[in-house]
Structure formats: structure tokens, C-alpha cells
């Protein structure tokens, strides 16, 4: 019974899933990254019907984040499943993509 209660308590502490409306309100702190996000990422990552993981959706981003930032960067640059190559951001540099990935996964401010 103790294990069941502990699991229930942990589940109650988990953040509620983010909604597309909540994801649409999120913006990177850096103005340049915010502009790139608005122009290239937001249309899919704030749309619950796009198939892309929502911005700051911890449940969706956790397994991706565990793959490592280098893998995620490769997915963005090369394209992966529904993700178009370069994420439709031809103006983005590798550092921009890394900042966008950290923002999307709710790890903004972290480095490698």
C-alpha cells in the first residue's frame, strides 16, 4: 500500500500537460530567438494538431531531451519525420537552433 500511495503522490506532483493555447503564449527570453521562434517554430509547436511536440510539453520533450542536444540538433538540421530540414529557418545558425531546442524543451538558459 505504501508504494501505491507514493506513486499516486508523485503523479499528483507532475505538472499538468500544457495546452496549445498555453504553448502559444510562451516566448523565448532572448528577442532574437523569440523572433526566430515566432517565424519558424511556433506554427507547429503551438498547434496541437501538427504532430510536433508542444513548446514546454515536458512529457513529450523528456524522451527527446534524453537523446542529447546533438541528436536533436541533427534532427533539426537534417529533418526528421515531420520536422522539415532546418526547421524552415534558413536564417538560423547552429547556436540559434540550440537555443530554440532548449526553449522548446523548457531548458532555456542551460548549456550543453
Positions of predicted regions on the chain:
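Bacterial signal peptide processing site
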Residues: 14-17
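Short Cys/His-rich Zn2+-coordinating modules
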Residues: 21-29
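C-terminal motif of bacterial Sec signal peptides marking the signal peptidase cleavage site
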Residues: 9-12
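Gly/Gly-Pro-rich "capping" loops immediately C-terminal to redox-active cysteine motifs
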Residues: 46-74
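The canonical Cys-X-X-Cys-His
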Residues: 37-47, 100, 104
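Short sequence/structural segments immediately N-terminal
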Residues: 30-38, 106, 110-111
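Bacterial N-terminal signal peptides that target proteins for export
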Residues: 1-3
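Axial heme c-ligation environment in periplasmic c-type cytochrome domains
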Residues: 54, 75-98, 104-107, 111-112
Amino acid at each position: 500500500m505504501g508504494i501505491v500511495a507514493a506513486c499516486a503522490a508523485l503523479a499528483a506532483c507532475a505538472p499538468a500537460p500544457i495546452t496549445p493555447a498555453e504553448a502559444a503564449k510562451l516566448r523565448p527570453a532572448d528577442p532574437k530567438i523569440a523572433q526566430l521562434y515566432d517565424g519558424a517554430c511556433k506554427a507547429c509547436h503551438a498547434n496541437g494538431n501538427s504532430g510536433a511536440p508542444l513548446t514546454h510539453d515536458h512529457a513529450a520533450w523528456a524522451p527527446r531531451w534524453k537523446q542529447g542536444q546533438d541528436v536533436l540538433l541533427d534532427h533539426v538540421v537534417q529533418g526528421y519525420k515531420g520536422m522539415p530540414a532546418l526547421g524552415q529557418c534558413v536564417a538560423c545558425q547552429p547556436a540559434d537552433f540550440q537555443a530554440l531546442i532548449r526553449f522548446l524543451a523548457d531548458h532555456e538558459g542551460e548549456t550543453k
